[in-house]
A protein has these predicted regions:
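N-terminal binding-site loop/beta-alpha segment at the start of enzyme catalytic domains
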Residues: 1-84, 144
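A cross-domain feature marking catalytic cores of carbohydrate-active enzymes
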Residues: 20, 56-58, 88-90, 122-125, ...
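Short, well-ordered coil/turn segments that N-cap beta-strands
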Residues: 11-16, 50-52, 79-84, 115-119, ...
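Conserved, mostly hydrophobic/aromatic
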Residues: 6, 18, 39, 54, ...
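Glycine/proline-rich, positively charged
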Residues: 26, 93-189, 193
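Aromatic-lined glycan-binding groove of carbohydrate-active enzymes
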Residues: 189-226, 262
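Conserved short secondary-structure transition element at the edge of the structured enzyme core
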Residues: 143, 230, 238-282
Length: 282
């Protein structure tokens, strides 16, 4: 396993971040999640392979149970908390990043994860109903209290990222060091403005959906996976762009066949060729 420093932080992370959205108790919107036994198997295998970077959220699995499940797994398989880097997120449970919500949600996450701190605390989306000054000040309080080591953001626009970091800079607060946005061979919107901003801010990306929800791993088929039968987010992201995606997917297949490797490796090689990408969430 190769490791990389996460942006301007001192976090040394594996170049693969294990996404933990698939772990947790099933719910109406997440009927495909894996139980504790299956979670243990995957977490143990990841650790054995040298993966030390894990990404979850307070809303993954019913009642935030992804955090609970991986917390249980870490208790079983991790001897020293410093050996792993845990990222979790805040917003969806309460739909906001007000001070009250942030303070409640971090305590809930820490309890479920069975840890005293998280290494990277990410705002899951922008909160249009509360001032970003309130959000950044509250997040800074978490850093000062040592409940959180570093801050990140997810799925926000470049102007929002710059605004948040400039406000933090003006007040001497902790800034966002990384962003987790949607980015892969068939979705490259971030190349319009976000990438240039990341380079100027000396930030890094930990992109999600590096495989395009599996679309970059095989030739296109109209037969849906279990997740695509039930997950409105996955359907929304890719179903409408099928005709645009298929030529790219076919080209990935051609390259994979020529190199005698899997399509997934081609998609990953493309992601890893980008200097602003630290570790894709897989």
């Amino acid at each position: 396993m190769e490791y990389i420093k996460l942006g301007k932080s001192d976090l040394k992370v594996s170049k693969i971040c294990l996404g933990c959205m698939s772990f947790g108790e099933k719910s109406k919107s997440l009927p495909w999640t894996l139980d504790q036994e299956q979670t243990d198997i995957i977490i143990k295998k990841a650790l054995d392979l040298g993966i030390n970077f894990f990404d979850t959220a307070n809303c993954y699995g019913a009642n935030g149970s992804s955090e609970k499940f991986i917390g249980n797994s870490f208790k079983k398989f991790v001897k020293d908390r410093k050996d792993i880097v845990i990222a979790t997120k805040v917003r969806w449970n309460e739909g906001k990043t007000s001070k009250e919500a942030i303070m409640r949600e971090i305590d809930g996450s820490l309890k479920r994860l069975q840890t005293d701190y998280v290494d990277l605390y990410i705002i899951h989306r922008w909160d249009y109903d509360h001032p970003i000054e309130e959000t950044m000040e509250s997040l800074n309080e978490l850093v000062k209290s040592k409940k959180v080591r570093y801050l990140g953001c997810s799925s926000i626009f470049p102007y929002q990222l710059l605004k948040a970091n400039m406000i933090a800079r003006q007040h001497g607060w902790a800034e966002f060091i990384s962003i987790q946005n949607h980015y892969n061979l068939i979705y490259r919107e971030e190349e319009r403005e976000m990438i240039q901003l990341l380079e100027e801010e000396k930030m890094v990306m930990t992109p999600y959906s590096a495989m395009g929800a599996g679309r970059l791993c095989r030739l296109y088929t109209d037969e849906p996976t279990e997740r695509f039968k039930d997950d409105p987010n996955a359907i929304f992201k890719y179903a409408q762009a099928k005709d645009l995606d298929i030529p790219v997917i076919k080209r990935v297949k051609e390259v994979a066949d020529k190199m005698k490797i899997s399509m997934a490796l081609v998609a990953l090689a493309w992601i890893y060729s980008k200097p602003y990408v630290a570790a894709p969430v897989l």
